[in-house]
Amino acid sequence: PPPAGAGRDDEGLRAQRTFTALMRAMAAPGMIEKLVIPPGVPAAFPQGLAAVAVTLADFETPLWLDVQLASAPEVARYLRFATGAPIVEDPARAAFALVSRATAMPPFTWFSTGSDAYPDRSVTIVTEVQTWAAMHRFELTGPGIATTRSFAAGPLPGDFETRMAENRALFPRGVDLIMTSGDEVVALPRSTHLREAA
């Protein structure tokens, strides 16, 4: 049998590896990093979203679930057990918003963008995309990018470029965006400039 505490050690290692991947993704916008998927994720919960939520959320970080996730009670049960985080119905109160697919992403105006004094009191939106293929291709610039970086993902909302430009204009306020696809993750922090590639 495994030694006592081995399960907790495995859990801690998974969380540490995913946390490191997320920090690398935030530091290098548009770069794909690998997540470690936790066990027992409900079928209705995209695995990448679960990995990010379990790693970043705790009892002090309210979570908001989109309609599809909220309609599957096992998702909220899993999150409460794995994180202790409260589930909120008001998106403006959320520290993290979990969106089952990027095309269903609500307007950023639903969420807190922080304040000039406390820009960190804003939301991080975590959403799932189907692919990193060139359904929508963009050029990224900003902190963590030496010159420009090509980034593609899809499908995305039709107004995605406009949303990101409006969000960047709020800096240092604004939302941070994390995209997952299976066990892969990309981050687009609020400091990132995004424009559609020619």
Regions found by a protein language model. Name each.
Residues 68, 73-198:
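Internal, well-folded beta-alpha domain core
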